[in-house]
């Protein structure tokens, strides 16, 4: 079982005399920078010159520099850039400014685990990964609570890497909900697996296929959308709040019996075998190699798949239905 560390077991001592540079001011970047700043820590934001986020970060009361200048000024550097952009920025603007005893921080282990970034031996390398989107990390912090997080130490050059990770996690509010100790390998491989077979890939494929089956069988696309896509949130919210047990308890007996008897026929041993194949490609680096090579040529396959998704009948019908739900449109705009 994982080791869990809570707020009253941590302090800011490891970071009190350090300068933290948060590279990026997107979903996670703005939450990390503002939470750390409001926790009383010394924070600067690193952005490319001319970034549209520059003025926003300054208006939030933060000091902003270029990535090059920020990495020179800081001794704890959190890289919150897209996975495919991290290595190029690191080697051109961060590594040349690293000093012995500095710390590199990541919120996902992809680039370290797959050797896209190979840090010098005289710096600490650790991970702090909140298990929630940036706006939730920020909102829960302001409410005096937090989202759970993960910490991992990859390289402990100073003997202080774990203490730094815990202080950083405390600074963004994660220790309020508990932080779980893991490794870069475990976080990376389980995160990619979840994205591919369940949360993003598996769920979207299941929704689309179920929608297509109903439409092909002659049912109205609108009815198919409601039953296979729109209502997913209702079920997921129940699972999120109380696990599968809460969901089964909350649905009708008809839904429970049908779901329990038919579900295993749909997600069956063939599906399990495909999941193991996906996991193997993650573990042996095949997926990482494929993704990195795809990025080197500007993601032609990804862009083609994105176009196909936008043109799918599910998306066309979904946009029409959502247009008739004003409160839903307002919520999306607010987020």
Curated annotation (Swiss-Prot):
This is Ketol-acid reductoisomerase (NADP(+)). Residues 1-182 form the KARI N-terminal Rossmann domain. It comes from Methanosarcina mazei (strain ATCC BAA-159 / DSM 3647 / Goe1 / Go1 / JCM 11833 / OCM 88) (Methanosarcina frisia). Residues 183-328 form the KARI C-terminal knotted domain. Involved in the biosynthesis of branched-chain amino acids (BCAA). Catalyzes an alkyl-migration followed by a ketol-acid reduction of (S)-2-acetolactate (S2AL) to yield (R)-2,3-dihydroxy-isovalerate. In the isomerase reaction, S2AL is rearranged via a Mg-dependent methyl migration to produce 3-hydroxy-3-methyl-2-ketobutyrate (HMKB). In the reductase reaction, this 2-ketoacid undergoes a metal-dependent reduction by NADPH to yield (R)-2,3-dihydroxy-isovalerate. Its EC number is 1.1.1.86. It is an enzyme of class 1 (oxidoreductase). The active site is at residue 108. Pathway: Amino-acid biosynthesis; L-isoleucine biosynthesis; L-isoleucine from 2-oxobutanoate: step 2/4; Amino-acid biosynthesis; L-valine biosynthesis; L-valine from pyruvate: step 2/4. The keyword 4Fe-4S does not apply. Belongs to the ketol-acid reductoisomerase family. It comes from the Archaea. Its cofactor is Mg(2+). It holds the Pfam family KARI_C. GO terms for biological process: isoleucine biosynthetic process; L-valine biosynthetic process. Mg(2+) 2 binds at residues 191, 227, 231. Substrate binds at residue 252.
